[in-house]
A protein has these predicted regions:
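N-terminal interaction/assembly modules
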Residues: 1-117, 121-133
Length: 133
């Protein structure tokens, strides 16, 4: 599976976890893969379950970099993109931050409103600088 497709499928799973807070990660994953046939590989599983298990740490990091934004104002789509990208930046050092940010921008352009990608870009650049130190 190409990384771009894997990242998009991980985003779909994370988006569902943002929207379906009453379901466990395992339930979301099972429904998406077995019922709807969402393709996955090791990357998809690692990012989805890793972002779910580390959601508190990821959210704390994101909140430090929101600069004038309240979490409640962020669309579920942008929140899922930020969680995915934050997980990559924070826990997957083998993926360059620039690649993560560019792919997150592409997801925002495809799935969210026209202004979302610049917001996503700004937040992720700030987070990447923190983790580059």
């Amino acid at each position: 599976m190409q990384r771009k497709l894997a990242r998009e499928n991980a985003f779909i799973l994370i988006f569902e976890s943002v929207c379906k807070k009453d379901e466990t990660a395992e339930e979301i994953f099972e429904k998406a893969t077995e019922v709807r046939g969402l393709e996955y590989d090791d990357y998809v599983k690692t990012v989805f379950f890793g972002s779910y298990e580390n959601s508190t740490k990821i959210e704390e990091t994101m909140e430090k970099h929101l600069k004038g934004w309240k979490k409640s104002r962020i669309s579920p789509c942008a929140m899922a993109i930020l969680r995915l990208a934050c997980y990559e930046i924070m826990f997957m050092a083998d993926i360059p931050s620039k690649v993560t940010i560019n792919e997150a921008i592409e997801l925002a352009k495809k799935y969210d409103d026209e202004k979302s990608y610049s917001f996503v870009n700004g937040v992720l650049n700030s987070i990447a600088l923190e983790f580059a130190e």
